[in-house]
């Protein structure tokens, strides 16, 4: 079992969805409204199983049977921090039961609070974790590489790097959204050089 944590906008979901294109990789994206039954149905759907009509226990057994018959699968549960709180751990216990009784690898991903929630409320799951990765965002060189090909003034480059790497609010998503608006402004004005003023204009189009 593996755990991947990182702040919103760091690229977890995009990366996991790309990986899920590989054979025998099943991907489920969770949300706050999911019940235990919804989670089971989402796993059934991503595996191509017909949605069951029995109890959750019977349907989970069907999922276990699938993994034990079709060996070599990886099950990715994204946004898993939305499944657990101090009031409910049932949905995560379903995942632990599938992992314990199936021949399947499981990767659970979410925001940093997922790590604390598992350690606090799900000790039996925590001691099953073989691999743990905490994403730290883009490096300065990665930002520079991403911006290659753009004509950027030095102060504009510094601002874009801050948007990508600031520990409080910086992330790839903010950098990408800013650049999208910058391109719109340049296209409308016929310009080619990204300046600090243009970045400020681009920011004015966003909710920051």
Predicted feature locations:
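Conserved P-loop NTPase "ATPase switch" module shared by AAA+ and STAND
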Residues: 66-88
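Central P-loop NTPase core of STAND/AAA+ ATPases
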Residues: 45-70
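Conserved NTP-binding/hydrolysis module of P-loop NTPases
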Residues: 24-27, 35-53
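Sensor-1/coupling segment of RecA-like P-loop NTPase cores
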Residues: 2-8, 98-122
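Conserved catalytic network of the ASCE P-loop NTPase/AAA+ motor domain
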Residues: 20, 65-70, 97-104, 122-128
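Conserved catalytic segments around the Walker B and adjacent sensor/switch elements
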Residues: 2, 20-32
């Amino acid at each position: 079992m593996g755990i991947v944590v990182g702040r919103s906008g760091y690229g977890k979901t995009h990366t996991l969805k790309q990986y899920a294109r590989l054979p025998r990789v099943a991907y489920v994206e969770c949300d706050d409204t999911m019940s235990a039954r919804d989670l089971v149905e989402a796993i059934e759907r991503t595996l191509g199983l017909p949605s069951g009509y029995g109890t959750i226990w019977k349907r989970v057994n069907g999922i276990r049977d699938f993994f034990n018959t079709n060996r070599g699968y990886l099950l990715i549960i994204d946004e898993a921090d939305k499944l657990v709180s101090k009031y409910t751990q049932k949905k995560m216990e379903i995942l632990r039961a599938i992992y314990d009784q199936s021949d399947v690898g499981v990767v659970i991903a979410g925001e940093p609070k997922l790590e604390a929630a598992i350690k606090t409320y799900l000790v039996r799951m925590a001691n099953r974790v073989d691999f743990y990765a905490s994403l730290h965002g883009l490096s300065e060189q990665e930002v520079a590489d991403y911006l290659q090909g753009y004509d950027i003034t030095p102060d504009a480059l510094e601002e874009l790097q801050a948007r990508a790497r600031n520990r409080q609010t910086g992330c790839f998503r903010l950098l990408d959204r800013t650049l999208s608006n910058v391109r719109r402004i340049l296209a409308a004005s016929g310009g080619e050089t990204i300046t600090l003023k243009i970045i400020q204009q681009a920011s004015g189009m966003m909710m920051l």
